[in-house]
Design a protein with these regions (language model features):
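Metallocofactor- and cofactor-centric catalytic cores in central/energy metabolism, strongly enriched
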Residues: 2-135, 149, 161, 175-177, ...
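Short beta-strand segments
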Residues: 33, 58, 87-90, 140-143, ...
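Short amphipathic alpha-helical segments
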Residues: 43-44, 152-154, 212-213, 240
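Short hydrophobic alpha-helical runs that function as membrane-insertion/retention elements
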Residues: 118-119, 139, 226-227
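Active-site histidine-anchored catalytic micro-motif
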Residues: 132-142, 147-202, 208
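A conserved active-site cap/scaffold subdomain adjacent to cofactor or substrate pockets
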Residues: 167, 190-262
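Intrinsically disordered, low-complexity terminal tails and inter-domain linkers enriched
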Residues: 185-190, 380-393
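Internal helical hairpin/lid segments
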Residues: 236-332
Length: 394
């Protein structure tokens, strides 16, 4: 049964005290797969507040970071068409792609070159822009996880203007974790599996899809798992539950965000997602193709699909789209193999002002979160081992 009922009634200090009183016989590595969780962990200083034998590992929780270069190339090319207005969530503007220095390497640079690119905060803004510019084609470059895809689906289901097209780059979160746990391989590309003993599942995704989406981590891999919200109190409650499960040998899925996350999730949103979008194999930047991890518009909504409406067959850049820039360790950071300050470029060539890799661009990227949180000391001692065997907090 859940260990953290009425968790919101305890303060962060109360939860820390409870955790410190636990008798942990060995180190416990806890993976998070949400940029919001990593931001709270870093800003609240939870790594240094917790006992030394509890390790918190940032994982694949940033949709901007894993958005394929090919999709960004497509968005740039469309934006440079004078008959098109491209709308996009703001954190995609500065994501760089691999091109020669003299060529456009981000949507921000395309905008500076004259492209009509407009940052938006919600899908309904895309609808409003399309309605007020009937003489233009509006392309909505929509990248994100389930929480973002649900309102995109709702926008289309409600009836979008004919001049609105969607360049979709949506992903599901759980298949990435399943891939990590299963084999450490994606589309034939092998990598070092992260070492983790438990999982903190993202509360916002569970709000839409239901906490049950993460039951497989318990059933198939016997790992303690807890859904958490975004306050220090909710995360600490999840850590406490996970640690108790580990100590007592009683593994289950706990919901430490019960005030928001309900059993079964949001059934209306799920029904709309299923009607508007299909699930397919999808490429994750730096990782490879993960089965059943991507969203694409269903046949019923194909008229809104930018990929059906436009053609890129003769675009050489698109055909040669790669993954991470040379020297960039974003893939290892995303997969939980490295802390951000163990990347070879962190704080040297790569900073928020001049980012090289996508993890330094997005507000949900671990590198950007660490830098903004003041964790700027480079951990040069571990660059040769590329492991998370010890705490490397600056």
């Amino acid at each position: 049964m859940p260990l953290t009922t009425k968790s919101t009634r305890l303060s962060a200090q109360d939860w820390l005290q409870r955790i410190r009183e636990l008798d942990l016989p060995e180190k416990v590595r806890i993976l998070n797969v949400c940029g919001g969780h990593e931001r709270t962990i870093t800003q609240a200083g939870l790594r240094t507040a917790l006992p030394a034998n509890i390790e918190l590992i940032p994982g694949p929780g940033c949709p901007v970071c894993i958005c394929p270069e090919q999709d960004i190339f497509d968005a740039i090319q469309l934006a440079l068409n004078e008959d098109i207005i491209l709308v996009v969530f703001g954190d995609m503007l500065r994501v760089p792609v691999n091109v020669p220095k003299r060529e456009i390497r981000s949507l921000e640079q395309a905008k500076a070159a004259g492209a009509d690119i407009r940052p938006i905060a919600s899908p309904m803004e895309a609808v409003n822009i399309a309605m007020s510019h009937a003489d233009k084609t509006i392309v909505f470059f929509a990248a994100g996880f389930e929480t973002t895809m649900a309102p995109v689906a709702a926008m289309l289901a409600a009836g979008a203007p004919d001049n609105l097209k969607v360049l979709l780059s949506g992903r599901l979160t759980w298949p990435a974790v399943a891939m990590l746990l299963k084999s450490g391989e994606a589309s034939g590309e092998s990598f070092c599996k992260p070492k983790f003993d438990a999982l903190v599942a993202p509360g916002h995704v569970a709000t839409i899809m239901g906490p049950e989406e993460w039951q497989f981590v318990v059933d198939d891999y016997a790992l303690p798992t807890a859904v958490a919200g975004f306050s220090p109190e909710s995360l600490l409650a999840a850590f406490y539950s996970i640690l108790r499960q580990k100590i007592e040998g009683n593994v289950f899925l706990d919901n430490c965000y019960a005030e928001v996350v309900k059993p079964g999730g949001n059934l209306v949103a799920q029904k709309t997602l299923s009607a508007v979008m299909d699930v397919s194999h999808a490429h994750w930047r730096g990782i490879g193709s993960i089965p059943d991890s991507g969203f694409q518009l269903s046949e019923q909504y194909a008229a809104f699909d930018a990929r059906h409406f436009f053609s890129w067959e003769n675009d050489s850049q698109r055909k040669h789209a790669g993954d991470m820039p040379p020297g960039c360790d974003c893939t290892r950071v995303i997969l939980g193999n490295l802390y951000p300050n163990q990347c070879r470029l962190y704080g040297n060539a790569c900073t928020p002002r001049s980012p090289i890799g996508p993890c330094m661009v997005s507000d949900e990227g671990a590198c950007r979160i660490w830098w903004s949180g003041g964790l700027r000391q480079i951990d040069s001692k571990t660059l040769t081992s590329n492991s998370l065997d010890s705490k490397t907090m600056a």
